[in-house]
Amino acid sequence: MSELWTLENIDADGAIREASDAVGDTRMDFFKKAAVGGGTLVAGGALMGGLPALAAATTRKSKKNDTAILKFALTLEYLEAAFYNEAVNGGALSGEVLEAAKIVQAHENTHVKTLKTLVKLKSPTFDFQNTTKDQATFIATAQKLEDTGVKAYSGQAPNILQPTVLAAATSILTVEARHASRFRTLNGANFAPAAFDKPASMKAILKAVKATGFITG
């Protein structure tokens, strides 16, 4: 792990740790406090209510906001890591698809491990609804998840205050873009469909993740 990724270097004055402790170490704490108490469960759904307030909060640069963005990123990385862990271990993949999945699996688990050194947030529980049981369905789902990850990181990069946190986030962003390109190719799609990517807000990303139904608690 590079020096960039140590908590001591990114959080020399303790601001991230202080803000993280204030937010809490569970996914429920994160969404409830970031959304100013708007955390009601979506019926049968993946995430909590009050998400527009959470998204609005991420447009104001501060060290506390950097912590919220890191926790948002960690939630997405938990999802991706769990998805690839299930797919690789499930036995439905083969050939170059399995090879790609193993590479991405290692990356996503490293992202989780690294982000967990920066902020405290427990992993959600997941139900991937058989998307890992069939190779074609897995490829299509992986493409969507990776495209979503790219949009999520690019959408939050302008909202990050601390240069070291920004550097950490953008170094993950470029890897997520490589993942997306690979699964686009495997899915028969254009590996680079445009000269410029359109970022997405946190609100839009959370809505997209909720729509999958993958996060169950």
Segments the model singles out, each with a brief description of its role:
Residues 2-26, 35-36, 46-217:
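All-alpha RGS (Regulator of G-protein Signaling) helical domain and cognate RGS-like helical scaffolds
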Residues 32:
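Phosphate-coordinating loops and pocket residues in cytosolic domains that bind phosphorylated ligands
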